[in-house]
Amino acid sequence: MLGAALRRCAVAAAARAGPRGLLHSAPTPGPAAAIQSVRCYSHGSSETDEEFDARWVTYFNKPDIDAWELRKGINTLVTYDLVPEPKIIDAALRACRRLNDFASTVRILEAVKDKAGPHKEIYPYVIQELRPTLNELGISTPEELGLDKV
């Protein structure tokens, strides 16, 4: 990206210089033409783990959540570099149940297993924490459905 900006400046300087070349009577570029090294970092406040969890639980607990918002929330949550806390997954599963979206419940549980990666103790812990909710809502895990063997 910086190389392209340098090329554009060189081409513009050559065009301004005319046929006599760059060393003769080229006007000096103003401060606006100078290339600056600028890094765009976020200067917003950082969110604590508790605030993050509360934000997602509140999102999935919205009484008027629709199927599109549910899928959008799940997709966004899956993009984070973390395994969601069981209370977030609980809220998402309850939202799926309110919408009668069984496929999304299986997708959420598969995503949690995938996000756990090589840490084999995380997924069983999450399922253990969610077991009362799974039983209450009548949700089967992908393993109970035989989807882990496909």
UniProtKB/Swiss-Prot annotation:
Biological function: Component of the cytochrome c oxidase, the last enzyme in the mitochondrial electron transport chain which drives oxidative phosphorylation. The respiratory chain contains 3 multisubunit complexes succinate dehydrogenase (complex II, CII), ubiquinol-cytochrome c oxidoreductase (cytochrome b-c1 complex, complex III, CIII) and cytochrome c oxidase (complex IV, CIV), that cooperate to transfer electrons derived from NADH and succinate to molecular oxygen, creating an electrochemical gradient over the inner membrane that drives transmembrane transport and the ATP synthase.
Segments carrying motif SIFI-degron: 2-17
Subunit structure and binding partners: Component of the cytochrome c oxidase (complex IV, CIV), a multisubunit enzyme composed of 14 subunits. The complex is composed of a catalytic core of 3 subunits MT-CO1, MT-CO2 and MT-CO3, encoded in the mitochondrial DNA, and 11 supernumerary subunits COX4I, COX5A, COX5B, COX6A, COX6B, COX6C, COX7A, COX7B, COX7C, COX8 and NDUFA4, which are encoded in the nuclear genome.
UniProt-annotated location(s): Mitochondrion inner membrane
Gene: COX5A
GO molecular function, one term: metal ion binding
Post-translational modification: In response to mitochondrial stress, the precursor protein is ubiquitinated by the SIFI complex in the cytoplasm before mitochondrial import, leading to its degradation. Within the SIFI complex, UBR4 initiates ubiquitin chain that are further elongated or branched by KCMF1.
Source organism phylogeny: Eukaryota, Metazoa, Chordata, Craniata, Vertebrata
Sites of N6-acetyllysine modification: K87, K113
Record-listed Phosphothreonine modification sites: T141
Gene3D superfamilies, A to Z: Cytochrome c oxidase, subunit Va/VI
UniProt GO cellular component terms: mitochondrial inner membrane; respiratory chain complex IV
Transit peptide: 1-41
Keyword annotations: Acetylation, Heme, Iron, Membrane, Metal-binding, Mitochondrion, Mitochondrion inner membrane, Phosphoprotein, Transit peptide, Ubl conjugation
Protein name, UniProt field: Cytochrome c oxidase subunit 5A, mitochondrial
